[in-house]
Swiss-Prot record:
UniProt family annotation: Belongs to the monovalent cation:proton antiporter 1 (CPA1) transporter (TC 2.A.36) family.
Modifications after synthesis and translation: Phosphorylated by PKA, which inhibits activity. Phosphorylation at Ser-663 by SGK1 is associated with increased abundance at the cell membrane and activity. Phosphorylation at Ser-719 by CSNK2A1 regulates SLC9A3 activity through the formation of multiple signaling complexes.
Residue spans, topological domain Cytoplasmic: 74-81, 129-131, 203-204, 279-280, 323-329, 389-401, 467-832
N-terminal signal peptide: 1-29
Source organism per UniProt: Oryctolagus cuniculus
Name of the protein in its database record: Sodium/hydrogen exchanger 3
Disulfide cross-links: none
Consequence the record notes for mutating S719D: Does not change sodium:proton antiporter activity
Expressed in which tissues: Intestinal and kidney specific. Most abundant in kidney cortex, followed equally by ileum and ascending colon, then kidney medulla and jejunum. Is absent from duodenum and descending colon.
Classification of source organism: Eukaryota, Metazoa, Chordata, Craniata, Vertebrata
Chain intervals for the UniProt region annotation (Interaction with EZR): 575-589
Cellular compartments annotated: Apical cell membrane; Cell membrane; Recycling endosome membrane; Early endosome membrane
Domain comment, as recorded: The C-terminal intracellular domain is subject to extensive post-translational modifications and binding partner interactions which regulate transporter activity, scaffolding functions, downstream events and localization.
Known partners and oligomeric status: Homodimer. Found in the forms of complex and dynamic macromolecular complexes. Interacts with CHP1; this interaction increases trafficking and activity at the plasma membrane of SLC9A3. Interacts with CHP2 and SHANK2. Interacts with NHERF4 and interaction decreases in response to elevated calcium ion levels. Binds NHERF1 and NHERF2. Interacts with PDZK1 (via C-terminal PDZ domain). Interacts with AHCYL1; interaction is required for SLC9A3 activity. Interacts with EZR; interaction targets SLC9A3 to the apical membrane.
Binding site for a 1,2-diacyl-sn-glycero-3-phospho-(1D-myo-inositol): G140, S141, M397, Q496, I497, H499
């Protein structure tokens, strides 16, 4: 009932809009007559002609958006019928209503609107979110299907139709060989809009999708060249075409394809370079992405190059650097705006395909020509796919099976590109233009509606491998990366230049030159693989702790940090004794659960729950993100408020990374004093004298105020100077509560921040004589001056490291020493 109630208002609004649009000419005429009759000053006037064009555009966009809402009210319909087919049917209905109200087809899909305003957002979205590795790994197969396959389809379709025409089955038509080849060139290309609309709903495997979709993108160069060549031949006449013109056509293919690709790469380089310097103008970052990408499309059109290839490779080449340079808010804006524009353009295209088909002036019917075109397009597509796949499987590591070939043959959809190209034909030169237009509309409707309806059941019946939408695990990433290096090494040793070798060389070139030029220094460091792996491991540790606590039903994972075996911890609430089992005691227990006043807990007799509250408070104080006072920003159209989540992630990562690195340095500093060290006692004494001579008075300046640094000191600089001011200025302005103690000479333990590995947790402090030892990696005659942190805090001894214990939190909180005296008084309950 709710679905029907939701559909009623939408359909009523759609009908009202269509009727209003149908009555627009009458309204305009009535307004003109009314304006001629009335004289004098008018308070309010009706100026429809002043807003007619933008108003109609806004109404059609609204109608298209409401149509998508109506379609998705019923999941059963959209799961069976593709959205593109529903939009075409809706366009036919709306076009019929407009034609009945106005008696002429007022609205059609013109080539100018399609190529300059509707197609660019769809192709840019496809290129910007293209899986680059998958695309370039299958680039050879994609190029073969796009170039050879398109030429094959165009030639075989045109020649077959011409042969049937010579037999006299089609009747008398004013068409020659060049006209048939021209029609074959425009009807042979697979349409990227139709492929995206259908294959995204089918969810085939990634390799199959990228081959079909990549073919639909890259065959634009072949289609444009063939279309222009045969159109020029038709204009010149068959008698005037020479061999030089044919050679020029072949050269034109390479110029158009390579030139369009080069234009896209140049604009991608420019876009990446511009976004590197947009730190202080974050608000306009998304504008650069859309404007520069669109300029690449227009520039290629201006130079008569492949505009689709230009904007596709612009998106492919710039995505890595742009995503690293722009802020998180800008990246989100670009992502959603690009998806919105692409989805809206796709909706308008299919709807206007249906609306344009109701124009009676464009229809010329020839049954034999239409049916034979459908037959030849389908049959020669299948033959071409089988022949090319047989050739590719001799060299491909991952074979394309027969089931994949069936889906590829069936997925050769035609769409609005073919309709726009046939609409551009000159009726004076091509006498049967209306026949070509009518046949193209039938082919588009057949492939989008019929094949779109049946491709999903076909995929299910053939049991085609489907795509898996999941994030690969860290172990899978590491193994995949290791296999890449192994395969690259094998190709290098054997002297073969394969895609693994080329990918490795390109990665080195990108890391050494392109990333340094097009990417900010902070982005280069934040994208470091080792830091990313560390971040994922740290996040995995934190999730495991929280999951364990939720599974146990309490916060027991932070109750007893000194427990050796977490399995023996009793996570249940301790049972009160007979004396304490009173109502007043229970009330006090309930109140203490929310009491955060540590002084009141210290002054009174603490129960087991109070002790747990103290431990929980100190642990959360140590590991959680430092709260800050919120401050309101004044409105500004040029500056966005800083992202608290982004700063929080960076600070937690920096603090955790600092703690881990300190643990690693501590482990490295005392790795096994060698048994042979006693033989070099004199050399050590000399080195110690040299080291003491470099320190004033032979003592460490612990009283110097320069070493009273807080743990917020920037030891681990992961951002360049241009990134630092925002982060630390916001921290200064926030004036938050300081949870971390200052490191002075009286502090014996650093406050760790983040999840710590128990392998690096010491059992006891180190003797002060550690500074007098010579690290084992130094030669007998060398000496080293301790760093500031080593002077402030003595590193941990490697001899006191525990062996690998059950996973738990570190107990090295500064505040946790307050509970040292009460450890024996309130022991944790354990399972016996």
């Amino acid at each position: 009932m709710s679905g029907r109630g939701g559909c009623g208002p939408c359909w009523g609004l759609l009908l009202a809009l269509v009727l209003a649009l149908g009555a627009l000419p009458w309204t305009q005429g009535a307004e003109q007559e009314h304006h001629d009759e009335i004289q004098g000053f008018q308070i309010v006037t009706f100026k429809w002609h002043h807003v007619q064009d933008p108003y109609i555009i806004a109404l059609w966009v609204l109608v298209a958006s409401l149509a998508k809402i109506v379609f998705h009210l019923s999941h059963k319909v959209t799961s069976v019928v593709p959205e593109s087919a529903l939009l075409i049917v809706l366009g036919l209905v709306l076009g019929g209503i407009v034609l009945a109200a106005d008696h002429i087809a007022s609205f059609t899909l013109t080539p100018t609107v399609f190529f300059f305003y509707l197609l660019p957002p769809i192709v840019l979205d496809a290129g910007y979110f293209m899986p680059n590795r998958l695309f370039f790994s299958n680039l050879g197969s994609i190029l073969l299907y796009a170039v050879v396959g398109t030429v094959w389809n165009a030639a075989t379709t045109g020649l077959s139709l011409y042969g049937v025409f010579l037999s006299g089955i089609m009747g008398e038509l004013k068409i020659g060989l060049l006209d048939f080849l021209l029609f074959g060139s425009l009807i042979a290309a697979v349409d990227p809009v139709a492929v995206l609309a259908v294959f995204e709903e089918v969810h085939v495997n990634e390799v199959l999708f990228i081959i079909v979709f990549g073919e639909s993108l890259l065959n634009d160069a072949v289609t444009v060249v063939l279309y222009n060549v045969f159109q020029s031949f038709v204009t010149l006449g068959g008698d005037k075409v020479t061999g030089v013109d044919c050679v020029k056509g072949i050269v034109s293919f390479f110029v158009v394809s390579l030139g369009g690709t080069l234009v896209g790469v140049v604009f991608a380089f420019l876009l990446s370079l511009v976004t590197r310097f947009t730190k202080h103008v974050r608000v306009i970052e998304p504008g650069f992405v859309f404007i520069i990408s669109y300029l690449s499309y227009l520039t290629s059109e201006m130079l008569s190059l492949s505009s689709i290839l230009a904007i596709t490779f612009c998106g492919i080449c710039c995505q890595k650097y742009v995503k690293a340079n722009i802020s998180e808010q800008s990246a989100t804006t670009v992502r959603y705006t690009m998806k919105m524009l692409a989805s809206g353009a796709e909706t308008i295209i299919f709807m206007f395909l249906g609306i344009s088909a109701v124009d009676p002036l464009i229809w010329t019917w020839n049954t034999a020509f239409v049916l034979l075109t459908l037959l030849f397009v389908s049959v020669f597509r299948a033959i071409g796919v089988v022949l090319q796949t047989w050739l590719l499987n001799r060299y491909r590591m991952v074979q394309l099976e027969l089931i994949d070939q069936v889906v590829m043959s069936y997925g050769g959809l035609r769409g609005a590109v073919a309709f726009a190209l046939v609409a551009l034909l000159d009726g004076n030169k091509v006498k049967e233009k209306n026949l070509f237009v009518s046949t193209t509309i039938i082919v588009v409707f057949f492939t989008v509606i019929f094949q779109g309806l049946t491709i999903k059941p076909l995929v299910q019946w053939l049991k085609v491998k489907r795509s898996e939408h999941r994030e690969p695990k860290l172990n899978e990433k590491l193994h995949g990366r290791a296999f890449d290096h192994i395969l690259s090494a094998i190709e290098d040793i054997s002297g073969q230049i394969g895609h693994n070798y080329l990918r490795d060389k390109w990665a080195n070139f990108d890391r050494r030159f392109l990333s340094k030029l097009l990417m900010r220094q902070s982005a280069q460091k934040s994208r470091d693989r080792i830091l990313n792996v560390f971040h994922e491991l740290n996040l995995k540790d934190a999730i495991s702790y929280v999951t364990e606590g939720e599974r146990r039903g309490s916060l027991a994972f932070i109750r007893s940090p000194s427990t050796d075996n977490m399995v023996n911890v009793d996570f249940s609430t301790p049972r009160p004794s007979t004396v304490e089992a009173s109502v007043s005691y229970l009330l006090r227990e309930s109140a203490s659960a929310v009491c955060l006043d540590m002084q009141s807990l210290e002054q009174r007799r603490r129960s087991v729950r109070d002790a747990e509250d103290v431990i929980t408070h100190h642990t959360l104080q140590q590991y959680l993100y430092k709260p800050r006072q919120e401050y309101k920003h004044l409105y500004s159209r040029h500056v966005l408020s800083p992202s608290e989540d982004e700063k929080q992630d960076k600070e937690i990562f920096h603090r955790t990374m600092r703690k881990r690195l300190e643990s690693f340095k501590s482990a490295k500093l005392g790795l096994g004093q060698s048994k042979k060290a006693t033989k070099h006692k004199r050399e050590r004494e000399r080195a110690q004298k040299r080291r003491n001579s470099s320190v004033p008075n032979g003592k460490l300046p612990l009283d110097s105020p320069a070493y009273g640094l807080t743990l917020k000191e920037r030891e681990l600089e992961l951002s360049d100077p241009e990134e630092a001011p925002d982060y630390y200025e916001a921290e200064k302005m926030s004036g938050g509560i300081e949870f971390l103690a200052s490191v002075t000479k009286d502090t014996t333990s650093d406050s760790p921040a983040g999840i710590d590995n128990p392998v690096f947790s010491p059992d006891e402090d180190l003797a002060p004589s550690l500074l007098a030892r010579v690290p084992p990696w130094l030669s007998p005659g060398e000496a080293v001056v301790p760093s500031q942190r080593a002077r402030v805090q003595i590193p941990y001894s490697p001899g006191n490291f525990r062996r690998l214990a059950p996973f738990r939190l570190s107990n090295k909180s500064v505040d946790s020493f307050l509970l040292a005296e009460d450890g024996a008084e309130h022991p944790e309950s354990t399972h016996m």
